[in-house]
Amino acid sequence: MASSDTAEATRRDFLYVATAAVGAAGVAAVAWPFITQMNPDAATIAAGAPIDIDISPVTEGQIVRVFWRGKPIFIRHRTAKEIQSEEAADVGALIDPQPDSARVKPGKAEWLVVYASCTHLGCIPLGHQGDWGGWFCPCHGSQYDASGRVRKGPAPTNLPVPPYEFVDNTKIRIGAGVA
């Protein structure tokens, strides 16, 4: 009988292990969809990813609008006259004092990249408008200069500068360094 008990014990152990393995696989199969549904989908990941913009077709004086993370961005190719005017502006007289050099990349003063939403209530300003030739918000009359600094109206702050970098002389990466 001893050999029969050993065989029965071995068979019983095997059934315990097999049942536990099937049970674990079943739990994993049921849990897997719940775990994966907590991950962001591909559209969400892509929406926050940096984007590269080819700026070679943007002529001097032109403003283009692109979208990053669902928000509009202005890219302005400033003229030498605009750069000179903005660098000479009295920073102390501004509503939100900020020098022109703090709003552009060193050596690339001809390119200005800012969010295209008025800092008052989020309307999209019109380019090459207003008393300073920058942007004019048609909703409540805020005016920005060619550096995106608020000059007049209810807007409390300058147009924000998004994180960006120059990949090369003809390409800007918006969202660089953002996780």
UniProtKB/Swiss-Prot annotation:
GO CC terms, sorted: plasma membrane
Residue ranges of every copy of the Rieske domain listed in the record: 80-173
Transmembrane segments: 14-35
Alphabetized Pfam families for the sequence: Rieske, UCR_Fe-S_N
MF (Gene Ontology): 2 iron, 2 sulfur cluster binding; metal ion binding; ubiquinol-cytochrome-c reductase activity
Co-factor note (free text): Binds 1 [2Fe-2S] cluster per subunit.
Catalytic activity: a quinol + 2 Fe(III)-[cytochrome c](out) = a quinone + 2 Fe(II)-[cytochrome c](out) + 2 H(+)(out)
Keyword Iron-sulfur: yes
Enzyme Commission number(s) from the entry: 7.1.1.8
Protein role: Component of the ubiquinol-cytochrome c reductase complex (complex III or cytochrome b-c1 complex), which is a respiratory chain that generates an electrochemical potential coupled to ATP synthesis.
Note: The Rieske protein is a high potential 2Fe-2S protein.
Annotated protein name in UniProt: Ubiquinol-cytochrome c reductase iron-sulfur subunit
Organism the protein comes from: Blastochloris viridis
